[in-house]
């Protein structure tokens, strides 16, 4: 999320602030809202694709409406987490506990904790709101930062031994 809300010359105009945002969605809570009917139907045309595991074939169906939850009414499932400079990829380790925010214009690599994020939400550790969405305090969500591993982290992948591998524009190796 581009905190400058720039709409032109993005690489220049959307890079002034030290931190932008990762939008975290509690999809289980969103599903609860949908199940309760807290949505409006909006017309649109899209392909709904389904992969059938038994036949290893996919089918497509063209649909003409979608459920939309008005987040001005129901925003208890959306949270913003500050992340250094233009987050590109947000990657989760196999345990689901650690979330790496890859800021493509940052020299540091923040690692967030799912448990700390949940605690921050429960304890209302917010730094205000943006468009009605609570901003979780950076320190409240942060597990730690990898200092100066390179510049322009893009994505982090994990192996079975818990090691993380991050791709960069410029590496410090």
Describe the function of each predicted region:
Residues 1-173:
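Predominantly soluble domains enriched in secretory-pathway, periplasmic, or organellar proteins
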